[in-house]
A protein has these predicted regions:
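Non-ligating segments of multi-cofactor redox enzymes
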Residues: 1-178
């Protein structure tokens, strides 16, 4: 199967392919998958598709409507492509999507901690993954440089008014706000 075929099938849902990798035992991918392709949102297409959703399985009245919608659109794509759908919101145990994202080479750790996308900054997310039993060719996204490398001022480090990002004595406690 071609990577472009996966991209096209995922794009029809409003989601986008966010990169792929060939997992090792340390990656915690179940079922002996040879290739994992991450799926998520970057840009407005997912939100437009979610807002327009009205079919069965697109419940917007449940406790987790975006998760329900994601399952409703990604599971059929996985089935059609011969893959298994994995989700970051199912668990415990939870799949290590942040580590998987770093494995694709397409995102970087920002100075404040969250992963940053070279094109969309912090405005991106991972909604699922497609696990394939066969080894597929995936593009090397490692050449995408972090936008933080060329940002000398790093305003993100002191922009948050409550200091929610960065080290604190008790990381579980809410950030203080004066």
């Amino acid at each position: 199967m071609e990577y472009g075929t996966i991209q096209d099938a995922v794009a029809e849902t409003g989601l986008v392919v966010r990169g792929g990798f060939h997992p090792g035992a340390e990656d915690g991918v179940p079922g002996g998958a040879e290739t994992v392709v991450l799926v998520g949102n970057a840009g407005p297409a997912m939100w437009d598709a979610f807002a327009a959703a009205t079919g069965p399985g697109d419940r917007k009245d449940g406790p987790n409507p975006l998760d329900d919608w994601t399952r409703g659109v990604l599971a059929p794509v996985a089935g059609a492509l011969g893959a298994r759908a994995l989700y970051p919101f199912e668990g415990p145990p939870y799949f290590p999507f942040q580590r998987w994202a770093l494995r694709t080479g397409g995102v970087h750790v920002s100075p404040i901690g969250p992963l940053i996308d070279p094109e969309f900054g912090l405005w991106h997310a991972y909604r699922g993954a497609l696990a394939f039993d066969q080894r597929l060719e995936v593009p090397d996204l490692g050449s995408h440089l972090s936008p933080c490398e060329s940002c000398a001022e790093k305003p993100c480090l002191d922009t948050c008014p409550v200091g929610a990002f960065g080290p604190r004595e008790d990381p579980e406690a809410p950030a203080p706000y004066d």
